[in-house]
Swiss-Prot record:
This is Large ribosomal subunit protein bL19. This protein is located at the 30S-50S ribosomal subunit interface and may play a role in the structure and function of the aminoacyl-tRNA binding site. Keywords: Ribonucleoprotein, Ribosomal protein. Signal peptide: none annotated. It comes from Bradyrhizobium diazoefficiens (strain JCM 10833 / BCRC 13528 / IAM 13628 / NBRC 14792 / USDA 110).
Amino acid sequence: MNLIKQLEQEQFDKLSAGKDIPEFGPGDTVIVNVKVVEGDRTRVQAYEGVCIGRSGGGLNESFTVRKISYGEGVERVFPVMSPMIDSIKVVRRGKVRRAKLYYLRNLRGKSARIVEKQDRQAAVGE
């Protein structure tokens, strides 16, 4: 293992020690709780939307979340290992066949919806 990979692994372990980052991907609806600093106070703000892509890897990995706010599309890019992220929660899993869902930017209304992925284990267990 070379020196750069070793340093990155140490930083990755240190940053992810207190966090529980769930497995999620494009098409999943997530709630990202972000720490917002206002003056001398900090508060947690929830940002809910569809993950339209992940990029990078290791410490540099980030993901883009898109939501519709008052009829206007808003996208925000979050670094996965950011100390400003309090928690990430997956609300529902989406069934998509693309790694990047940039085509959602051009869709409106019902056509912009993503079909929910059916869990095969739950269907077998019933």
